[in-house]
Amino acid sequence: RDRRPRRPREDRPITPSVPKERELIPVSEAGMQQAEKLATDFVTGLLAKMGVEGQVKTLPQVECDQLRLEISGPDMGPIIGRRGDTLDAIQYLGSLVLNNALDEHVRLSVDTENYREKRAESLERLARKMAMKVVKAHRSMTLEPMNPYERRIIHAALQDFNGVTTYSTGTEPGRRVVIAPDNSYRNRDRG
């Protein structure tokens, strides 16, 4: 069979795909109160079993389906873990407990010592630094394995960075972000 390249149909314009924004489904006040008690009790119990002294408090909601918890105490290093792995595990387990017990879906965010914001800033700096290396060397660079939240930070930080494109490769838990030269930008630059 003849395999010639297909020509685009002229009656159908080619438009770039735009990612759909996640639809926020508000959680009822009663549901949020129940979620707050469940999550706080779960995380407090987990801290006790870990032998870590800490208090759990609720932070103000940012989005209508999100419950934010802050853990505070004298030594939060064991709670954060290596690159936030322990904190991510606490958040994941808390989410499972919440969403198995409730009729409504609640997104749980657990933080301590403002770790998540500091980590996001660190990842954004790393993304820009690596992107500049990619532009200079005209070679792709693959970052260390990251969780979906951290990969999203890298992609967002570089979406408007001229000369590079990003994509993820591999399978969980070893999925990585690749920062690659954007050839369309390079060709535009030359011509």
Predicted regions and their residues:
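Short, highly charged
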Residues: 30-107
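P-loop/Walker A NTP-binding module and the surrounding RecA-like catalytic core of P-loop NTPases
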Residues: 56, 95-100, 106-107, 117, ...
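Short hinge/gating elements
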Residues: 22-32, 74-80, 109-117, 138-144
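Intrinsically disordered, low-complexity RNA-associated tracts
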Residues: 1-33, 37, 185-191
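A short beta-strand motif that forms the metal-chelation/ATP-contact edge
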Residues: 66-72, 154-156, 177-181
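A generic structural signal for beta-strand entry/edge sites
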Residues: 64-66, 140, 174-176
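Conserved nucleotide-binding/hydrolysis micro-motifs of P-loop NTPases
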Residues: 62-64, 76, 85, 103, ...
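Intrinsically disordered, low-complexity glycine/proline-rich and charged
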Residues: 1, 163, 171-179
